[in-house]
Amino acid sequence: MLIPSKLSRPVRLEHTVVRERLLAKLSGANNYRLVLITSPAGYGKTTLISQWAAGKNDLGWFSLDEGDNQQERFASYLIAAIQQATGNHCAASEAMVQKRQYASLSSLFAQLFIELADWQRPLYLVIDDYHLINNPVIHDAMRFFLRHQPENMTLVVLSRNLPQLGIANLRVRDQLLEIGSQQLAFTHQEAKQFFDCRLTSPIEADDSSRLCDDVAGWATALQLIALSARQNNSSAQHSARRLAGINASHLSDYLVDEVLDNVDARTRNFLLKSSLLRSMNDALIVRVTGEENGQMQLEEIERQGLFLQRMDDSGEWFRYHPLFGSFLRQRCQWELAVELPEIHRAAAESWMAQGFPSEAIHHALAAGDAKMLRDILLNHAWGMFNHSELGLLEQSLSALPWSNLLENPRLILLQAWLMQSQHRYSEVNTLLARAEQEMSVEMDTAMHGDFNALRAQVAINDGDQDEAERLSMVALEELPLANYYSRIVATSVHGEVLHCKGKLTKSLAVMQQTEQMARRHDVWHYALWSIIQQSEILFAQGFLQAAWESQEKAFQLVREQHLEQLPMHEFLLRIRSQLLWAWARLDEAEACARQGMDVLSTYQPQQQLQCLALMVQCSLARGDLDNARSHLNRLENLLGNGHYHSDWVSNADKVRVIYWQMTGDKTAAANWLRQTPKPEFANNHFLQSQWRNIARAQILLGDFEPAEMVLEELNENARSLRLMSDLNRNLLLLNQLYWQAGRKSEAQKALLEALTLANRTGFINHFVIEGEAMAQQLRQLIQLNTLPELEQHRAQRILRDINQHHRHKFAHFDEGFVERLLNHPEVPELIRTSPLTQREWQVLGLIYSGYSNEQIAGELDVAATTIKTHIRNLYQKLGVAHRQDAVQHAQQLLKMMGYGV
């Protein structure tokens, strides 16, 4: 829950001086990105901006306190303030912040600005007391906010010091409106107005001006002069003499003498006790001070002018002026030291009664009351964990004695999940083992199940499949249905283990069960995870269309539950990119990979390795080796500076080995082969992938025999486990091995099976990536005219993509090639005496590449009848009658020019 008073603009008090000259300056605030009000305490920053904000509807107000240095809390209040200003216009951002489903503050703000793009009216956000922020992450995020906020938005920041917001750049670009302490200081005229409102006896203008000069226009000092004069029935001049030259750091003695010592004991006690509350209402005051009718007491304090600020229009919430509140808290620690723990306990109980556990924890920590802290955590910690209030949780758990944790295993489980969420896997098992060893009472079966479910998750994260399987099954036996979260975890781990072991059908069923459980209990990140796993399984089985449909369901869940900024969203974008790449939709594949990198932009660069590998893969499919090399340089740097799951390594190695194949870099392949450990098994898609990388490197080096052994074993595994996509890839690599070894019949057999299997997988680019060797074989198959219709169509599509991206054969018949050909001593006399036109050479190249007449017309952007004329002319010049004769003639010319065909 959010405290309403932190989102309420201060109510304009009676007897305040309207700062007309400053309000005139602020009237053009909408022309600036940032309005910055800076001064020491007590210069009237908040009062000025509350006057300016009066009557403005599209304005949100966020009053900070020390607790707002927690990123999650800061984000919650800031988005709530924006929602307040816009009438709940930014629903997606609000949902993301409520569920803590954002990668960073900057990415949350990026989503916010997308939603604000269609907000047309001027919009204002006021952040008061920004000097309380000392978290550099928040400073960075607010710099991002200022750089990217909409043009019609103005941020208003009130601070005692110059905030770390990169304001120099705004100042240079005239996008900053500044008001400092010199401008905030009262003028003679304003001081006269002030005293006329506050003093019972009028004061002469000269005296008022002199008093104003004595305290340099400091509003707090003027207020103290008036307060002291009223309390002591003394002259304002007497008070002013004491305050002359004083500043905030020397106020304590004055406030004791002139304020605290001049109120009755009951009011003094009330002031000191209530100052421990960062904000207060009737119920809090009654519980903390013991006074009946807390609302009346607050209003009386306000009437006396004792620096109390009303924080909302209803008058329910109040807070002390920061300067006075800080002074009172310091005095409370001195004067009520013995009572202090009890006061904090009372505050914690009252906050709990009103449903604010985070504020209650603040007071329980201050009271040093471990029992109270434990009780709050037992009742509310899991809710806070699910809302990602991780910093406060960690601080709270650290404050509890180990003995308290041992007596409450659920708190140990919570601490372990905190470690898990921070990827401190080794510490999780250490903590749980120590707890089990030192507990004086044995845990019940359900708690054992909770522990084992978490251990299973840690084991699978660590790649220990057997231990993960054992622990997940034990956990499912131990856990009652009521422990739904741990059951979801254990079921998910069980499904993932089955996936890793190649038991795809069983894994798919378990992941579907996980999805149903997670959806039923609104555990959205596990719901998303289970759908992604289903898509991966369907992809591995060769059902790419079904995998696509699972991904569509996952994208819908991401949109509905605002999961765009979870790292898992990158996983979804990545597998969509892989699927699009397989189907030769390269632009879309690359766009998804870039989106995935954007999702992870606030994380360690190593997290982007997989998407970066896909960027390389897209460049390789296009034949753009320069771009591929550029991406590879970064990829190899990341590989050398991190530890990765075997799946990540195999995907990175795949594009490296293909690049070496395309560039003929046998040295790099040999070095890699020497250093790369061989996987123990080949029973899932990532182990198959790494073995395939090894075989490809061996083929490049001419080591056909070991490569063939690898591929035959891979195929045996793939067939038995129904890893049909891997079988499709393996057959293509086996085809290349046979082709290079001169075993043309076996090469054709492997290729025919791969083409047939591609009717199921839809693969295009896995053929294209093999380049000219693949193109030659497909041309021959097309010319034989024996392929079934689907395979024939796919072969023609693959050939077209090879020609488009790799510029094989078509490029050989350009002007430079033709000139060299005509000057060759062995060129046929018929070509020398009846030379083809440049267009006819192009048509011959496309005929050789396997293009139909319609495809040639499309490639050259001319009418089909024109192509027929070109073909008739070139047949006549070459002395051939049939298409196959023209292909053979082109092949002879290419061989003569030294091209391997």
Swiss-Prot record:
Domain HTH luxR-type: 829-894
Sorted UniProt keywords: Activator, ATP-binding, Carbohydrate metabolism, DNA-binding, Nucleotide-binding, Transcription, Transcription regulation
InterPro entries named in the record: P-loop_NTPase, Sig_transdc_resp-reg_C-effctor, TPR-like_helical_dom_sf, TPR_MalT, Tscrpt_reg_HTH_MalT, Tscrpt_reg_LuxR_C, WH-like_DNA-bd_sf
GO molecular function: ATP binding; DNA binding; DNA-binding transcription factor activity
Listed NCBIfam families: PRK04841.1
Function (record text): Positively regulates the transcription of the maltose regulon whose gene products are responsible for uptake and catabolism of malto-oligosaccharides. Specifically binds to the promoter region of its target genes, recognizing a short DNA motif called the MalT box.
Protein name: HTH-type transcriptional regulator MalT
Organism: Klebsiella pneumoniae (strain 342)
